[in-house]
């Protein structure tokens, strides 16, 4: 399988059924819980999440940490989403992960963001990441990034009124 074929398969994955973290949690369990291997700074909000992750990434780099960063969406190449102190996730790692995921039998097939999140956490474990900055995707309690098990800090950027209903209804509920 080529990198381009792996990406085509990933992009074709659509979430089916009810939103929630159960699919990504099942996926992470099959991978031996890579999310347990690093501390995370979970970045949530409507705007500015990518900037906060970039600032954190720069701070981690300056401190000489073995770090990871997970953001979305990417601008040019999927590998921009998943980075460590050693660079972006290699094409070969993406192909290897997709080949594995395609062969697995799933009760509820994981969607694109579930798969991308699991790949990021797996890659962080493989690269010996100690601390990762992780940007939430769709946000709210059903976001795949909520499968993180060792959150050291949560950063909440601004929350737009257009997202309040989906995230809890009020700013107070979102903050909880």
Spans of model-derived segments:
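Short beta-strand-centered segments that line the small-molecule binding cleft or hinge
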Residues: 153
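A conserved segment at the C-terminal end of the G1
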Residues: 39-42, 51-68
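ATP-dependent carboxylate-amine ligase catalytic core
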Residues: 17, 21, 25-36, 61-149, ...
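Charged, amphipathic alpha-helical linker segments immediately N-terminal to NTP-binding catalytic cores
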Residues: 1-17
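Non-catalytic interaction surface on structured domains
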Residues: 7-11, 30-39, 56
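Short Gly/charged-rich anion-binding patches and loops
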Residues: 5, 55, 119
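Short N-terminal amphipathic alpha-helix/helix-capping patch enriched in small hydrophobics
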Residues: 6, 20-24, 39, 52
């Amino acid at each position: 399988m080529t990198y381009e074929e792996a990406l085509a398969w990933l992009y074709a994955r659509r979430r089916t059924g009810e939103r929630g973290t159960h699919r990504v949690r099942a996926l992470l369990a099959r991978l031996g819980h890579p999310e347990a291997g690093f501390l995370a700074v979970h970045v949530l909000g409507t705007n500015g999440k990518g900037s906060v992750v970039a600032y954190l990434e720069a701070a981690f780099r300056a401190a000489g940490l073995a770090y990871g960063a997970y953001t979305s969406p990417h601008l040019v190449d999927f590998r921009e989403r998943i980075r460590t102190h050693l660079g972006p996730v290699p094409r070969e790692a993406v192909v290897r992960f997709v080949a594995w995921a395609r062969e697995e039998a799933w009760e509820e097939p994981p969607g694109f963001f579930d798969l991308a999140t699991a790949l990021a956490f797996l890659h962080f474990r493989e690269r010996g990441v100690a601390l990762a900055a992780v940007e939430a995707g769709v946000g709210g309690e059903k976001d795949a990034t909520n499968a993180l098990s060792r959150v050291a800090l949560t950063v909440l950027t601004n929350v737009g009124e257009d997202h309040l209903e989906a995230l809890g209804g009020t700013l107070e509920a979102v903050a909880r």
